[in-house]
Amino acid sequence: MAREFSRTQRVAQEMQKEIAIILQREVKDPRVGMATVSGVEVSRDLAYAKVFVTFLNDGEPETVKSGLKALQDASGFIRMLLGKAMRLRVVPELTFAYDASLVEGMRMSNLVSNVVKDDAARRSAADRDEEA
């Protein structure tokens, strides 16, 4: 029976969970604030991992920039704790990147809901005009 997920996907999923726990409990840098791990991409040889994060106050570009810098500075510490938490021969080198997809998704959702609301208002106005 074939496996549903490849090893890299399983490792990435476990890394996402472990890094989220590490950021919540171990990283004390105030620049990181409330960081959420939204995804992890691992290379096929498990040597590199790209960690996608979002921040609580990510409306300000300076907050995002300083948060990413703090995470990159702490990547060695996070990697050491990750090595203790996971049983891997080689712990991947971590690179942190901001995940704008969540913010973009919320923006698109707001645009769609505004269009639906405007459309409903136009329909009700057109229905009132037809009745008169």
Curated annotation (Swiss-Prot):
Keyword match Cytoplasm: yes
Listed PROSITE patterns: RBFA
Molecular function, one GO term: ribosomal small subunit binding
Entries under SUPFAM superfamilies matching the protein: Ribosome-binding factor A, RbfA
Recorded family membership: Belongs to the RbfA family.
Function: One of several proteins that assist in the late maturation steps of the functional core of the 30S ribosomal subunit. Associates with free 30S ribosomal subunits (but not with 30S subunits that are part of 70S ribosomes or polysomes). Required for efficient processing of 16S rRNA. May interact with the 5'-terminal helix region of 16S rRNA.
Protein name: Ribosome-binding factor A
Organism from which the protein derives: Edwardsiella ictaluri (strain 93-146)
Lineage per the UniProt record: Bacteria, Pseudomonadati, Pseudomonadota, Gammaproteobacteria, Enterobacterales
